[in-house]
């Protein structure tokens, strides 16, 4: 799964963008691009890479951003997640299971790529969204659903026993990512990250502060964020390098996603006053 990690951890944003296109081509994954011209707000423009199923069958959308903050390798944020989704896309294609994939530009500059997609998304064909961000370091899958955990398309990924099997936990806060673009558009979404187990308690503490509501934080909130081990893997932290990416963490997420897709839908039990 780490096969393409080295190819994707490029600091130059234009080369990074082209590297993703090259990897998708090498893997035989046909894609289309969704773009927005350069502007004062987005000087490099926006380029999303989209993988669509062969039919218009309603399906899940799996997404991750491929851009990185200036000067960062962007290994955990977010090349690891890209590698996971590329492998998942290939597997589902071979199994003839319909699914949509989007590799978004501009997450680090205000979610410009996912906003572009969400505004133009056909809600009749996207049943739900699972967004991956920070999936290459840690041992515990953290899932933030903002109340979408019981939505039909997303419920298979949120069951108690299923989460226990994959060492996952539902949390009430994760840092805002591309999932927010879909929440604002009324499309149910989950956001997923992998963190060290001891970081879960910090996420719970951050949730008690109401997250960074409206983009505003307090000194206490920022202090908690900087105490988290996962923070060291992003934005120039001392673990913001490819050698810290853990293949076990990536496989954990991949196995969780694949099994969630393959799970048969839950059968709702009913009660009838009249039995034949």
Task: Give residue ranges: language-model regions.
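Hydrophobic/aromatic beta-strand patches that form the interior of the parallel beta-sheet core
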Residues: 60-62, 102, 128-130, 188-192
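Solvent-exposed, acidic/flexible segments
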Residues: 10-17, 74-78, 246-250
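Short, well-structured beta-strand/strand-turn elements
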Residues: 28-38, 186-197
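A non-catalytic alpha/beta surface segment that caps or lines the substrate-entry region
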Residues: 1-54
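Glycine/charged-rich beta-loop-alpha catalytic/anionic-binding loops adjacent to active sites
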Residues: 58, 62-70
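Glycine-rich beta-alpha junction loops
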Residues: 133-136, 194-199
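His/Asp/Glu-rich mid-to-C-terminal helical/loop segments that flank catalytic regions of hydrolases
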Residues: 201-276
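Acidic/histidine-rich catalytic neighborhood of metal-dependent amide-processing enzymes
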Residues: 45, 69-157, 164-175, 179-181
């Amino acid at each position: 799964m780490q096969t393409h990690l080295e190819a994707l951890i490029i600091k130059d944003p234009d080369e990074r963008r082209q590297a993703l296109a090259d990897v998708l081509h090498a893997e035989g994954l046909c894609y289309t691009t969704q773009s927005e011209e350069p502007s004062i707000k987005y000087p490099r423009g926006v380029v999303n890479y989209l993988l669509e199923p062969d039919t218009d069958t309603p399906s899940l959308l799996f997404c991750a951003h491929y851009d990185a903050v200036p000067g960062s390798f962007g290994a955990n944020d977010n090349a690891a997640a890209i590698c996971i989704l590329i492998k998942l896309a290939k597997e589902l294609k071979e199994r003839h299971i319909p699914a949509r994939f989007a590799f978004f530009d501009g997450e680090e500059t205000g979610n410009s790529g996912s906003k572009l997609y969400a505004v133009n998304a056909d809600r009749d064909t996207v049943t739900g969204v699972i967004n991956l961000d920070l999936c290459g370091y840690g041992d515990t899958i953290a899932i933030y659903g903002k109340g979408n955990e019981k939505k039909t398309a997303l419920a298979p990924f949120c069951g108690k026993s299923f989460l226990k099997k994959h060492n996952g936990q539902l949390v009430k806060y994760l840092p805002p990512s591309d999932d927010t673009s879909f929440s604002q558009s009324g499309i149910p979404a989950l956001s997923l990250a992998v963190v060290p187990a001891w970081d879960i308690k910090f996420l719970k503490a951050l949730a008690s502060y109401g997250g960074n509501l409206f983009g505003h934080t307090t000194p206490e909130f920022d202090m908690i964020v900087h105490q988290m081990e996962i923070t060291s893997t992003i934005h120039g932290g001392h673990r913001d390098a490819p050698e810290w990416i853990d293949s076990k963490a990536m496989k954990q997420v991949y196995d969780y996603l694949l099994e969630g897709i393959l799970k048969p839908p839950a059968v709702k039990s009913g009660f009838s006053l009249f039995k034949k």
